[in-house]
Every structure is written in C-alpha cells, then in structure tokens.
Amino acid sequence: MSTVLRFGIPKGSLEEATVDLFKQAGWQIGISSRSYFPTVDDGEMKCHLIRPQEMGKYVERGTIDVGIAGRDWIRENDSDVVEVCEMVYSKVSRRPVRWVLVVAQDSPVQGPEDLQGATISTELVEFTKRYFKERNIQVNVEFSWGATEAKVVDGLCDAIVEVTETGSTIRANNLRIVCDLMESVPVMVANKAAWEDPWKRAKIEQIATLLNSALRAEGMVGLKLNAPAEKVEAITGILPSQKAPTVAHLYKSDWVSIESILPEKEVRRIVPELLRLGAEGIIEYPLSKII
C-alpha cells in the first residue's frame, strides 16, 4: 500500500485560491514558477500542478489519486471518477460559475432551438455537442482558443458558449445571454481504485473535511463576552449562533461568560446592543475552520 497521496492542484484561475484555502485548512503549499511540482508540508502528500481541463482524465487513469477541478471540466471529459465533495469557491467569489449560451445583442435568437444549423464557438466542445444533440438541434461546434466573445461580435460564429460569474464581461461586449447551460463549482474527485484503498480514502476524507471547514469559516468570527446572569435571555436572543450560544457561569460570581459564532458583518450591529444590555469584556476573534 502506498503511503503517499498524489494530489492535483488546479493550475490557472483556481490556483491561488486553492493554495490559500489549503493554508487556511492547515497545509502550506509552495509553488515555484519553474516547477510543476508544488511543495507541501505533509510527508503523506505529493502535489502536482495540473490544468483543470485535464484533471479528470489524470484522476480517472490513476496518474494522480485525487484532485480539484471545476465540475464543468469533469463533465466535459465525461470522466469516470468519484466525486468526493463540492467546494464552492472561485477566483472572484464563493459562488458557482455559469456556462451560458451567448449571442450578439441584436441577434434574433431567443432560445437554443433557434440555432438549428448554426456555428457555435466554445472551449467546452464535448459538453456543448451533447447539450444540443440531446435536444435534436443540429449545430456545428468549434473549439475556441480564446477571445471567444470577440468571435460572435466579429461574425465568426453565430453564438458562443462561455463561462461567467457575473455576466459583466458579456454585457460590456454588447452581447446577450440566451440561457444557462450548466452551473459549475469546484469539486474534489478521486480515482476509483484510490477511493477503495482504506488509507488513501481516509486521507482524502481528512483533506476534504478540513478544506470545507475552512470554507465554512470564511466571513465568520467568534464573539466572547461577560454579562450579568439575569441578562442571559436578552443577550442570547439577539446573538446569532451556529446552534445556540455557549453559556458558562464565572467562578464565584453571578455573572456568566457567553460565546458564539456569527457572521463578521453582524458584529458592528450587535456590539452596541450588547453594551446596552450590560455586557463587558467583549472579545472578537478570527476563525480558520468550522468543523
């Protein structure tokens, strides 16, 4: 049994966000511009820098045991892998991206069915072919090497299938979204044989748990305070929490200590109310993980 887990780090737009997420979860990953083999402070892991577009096939073959890539590229390659978990993060935000069907603003196209016999340009060729084939719409799908939005503007194709988070670039180029084809988030995928290996599966699950706990902690803080015991109901009534605030009596005192986890943006609203109710010694502290 191998005691090293081969992990694929997505190269490109997700690279920095992934390294930052690992750091928050407890792993230090170092990436050199001169190497495709990142360093990691875990003797049980070996990291590989791999394009998300190719992650699925390398995981399926067993070249690597597990990796992170967008679900869009896993579906594009129709990869036969185990989806361990979703991990909702991206280069811009913590929300899914969308693959959308786009035409020029003045195009008469109102739906996919209006593109019968049309030429569509995209990076997501195989998925797009399947999408239209399932709807009995005959189209010519061409691979785009980049600058896809410009092609429909220049009349080089009738429509494009492009990825977006906010749609702002599409609107800025005087283009119009016809419909959404797919929503995608990063997913952790594992090789089937690796998933059946007890040691590797346990290691994969450990990593997945800690990465997702780091995601859950983003934007959250801990708040701790002391208050008179008679104010507990009033204070816990305004204090958000994961389940219920923790309340503990102070030693030889009729005061209590109250602790809770809440969104950071709520602190500025709640602190004045806590002070008004007699709270003292209010401490706000950052969270790296919520498990």
UniProtKB/Swiss-Prot annotation:
Q: Does the keyword GTP-binding apply?
A: no
Q: Which UniProt keywords apply?
A: Amino-acid biosynthesis, ATP-binding, Cytoplasm, Glycosyltransferase, Histidine biosynthesis, Magnesium, Metal-binding, Nucleotide-binding, Transferase
Compartment annotation:
Cytoplasm
Query: What's the EC number here?
Result: 2.4.2.17
Q: How is its activity regulated?
A: Feedback inhibited by histidine.
Q: Name one GO biological process term.
A: L-histidine biosynthetic process
Query: Which SUPFAM superfamilies does this chain map to?
Result: GlnB-like, Periplasmic binding protein-like II
GO MF entry, a single one:
ATP phosphoribosyltransferase activity
Protein name stated in the entry: ATP phosphoribosyltransferase
Q: What's the source species for this entry?
A: Trichlorobacter lovleyi (strain ATCC BAA-1151 / DSM 17278 / SZ)
